[in-house]
Amino acid sequence: MPRRRVIGQRKILPDPKFGSELLAKFINVVMVDGKKAVAEKIIYGALDILAEKSGKDRLEVFDTILDNIRPMVEVKSRRVGGSTYQVPVEVRPVRRNALAMRWLVDAARTRGEKSMSQRLAAEMLDASENKGSAVKKREDVHRMAEANKAFAHYRW
C-alpha cells in the first residue's frame, strides 16, 4: 500500500434532468458498456412510471427507496488464530449508497417484466413499500450481522 498521499474522490457531475448527484451515480450503476444515454432513458422512464403510480415527486420517492434499501451494518471476514470469523462492522455512508443502488439494479435485472424501465419501476415500487428482492437482501445482511454480534469485539 503506497504511503504517499491520499487520492481524493472524483466529483461526480449531477444528472442533466433533475440536477441530483445521487441520481447521476445511479445512472452510472445502471449503465452497461458505457452507454449512458440508454441508462438515462431507462432510469427516467422508470421514474416516470413510478411517479405515475405513486403520485409523488420523483426524487423524493427515489430517496425514500434508497433509505429502505441502505444497509447499516454488514459482516466482514476476519481471520483470528486459524479460524475465520464474520465480524459485523458499520457501513460507511458512501458504501451504503453504492450497495443500495447495486442491490436495486441487480434485483430489477432478475425480474420478469418486459423492459428494464418497467422492471426497475416495479422493483422501486416494491422497495418503497419495504418489500421486494433488494429490501430482502438488506434484511439478510442485517440478519447475518445480528447473528454474528458475538464477534463484534474483533473489529479493526
From Swiss-Prot:
Recorded GO CC terms: small ribosomal subunit
Source organism, top-level taxon: Bacteria
Gene Ontology BP terms: translation
PROSITE patterns documented for this protein: RIBOSOMAL_S7
Keyword Ribonucleoprotein: yes
Keywords attached to this entry: Ribonucleoprotein, Ribosomal protein, RNA-binding, rRNA-binding, tRNA-binding
Molecular function GO terms recorded: rRNA binding; structural constituent of ribosome; tRNA binding
Pfam families: Ribosomal_S7
InterPro entries xref list: Ribosomal_uS7, Ribosomal_uS7_bac/org-type, Ribosomal_uS7_CS, Ribosomal_uS7_dom, Ribosomal_uS7_dom_sf
Quaternary structure note: Part of the 30S ribosomal subunit. Contacts proteins S9 and S11.
Function, as annotated: One of the primary rRNA binding proteins, it binds directly to 16S rRNA where it nucleates assembly of the head domain of the 30S subunit. Is located at the subunit interface close to the decoding center, probably blocks exit of the E-site tRNA.
Family indicated by similarity: Belongs to the universal ribosomal protein uS7 family.
Protein name in UniProt: Small ribosomal subunit protein uS7
Originating organism: Idiomarina loihiensis (strain ATCC BAA-735 / DSM 15497 / L2-TR)
Annotated gene: rpsG
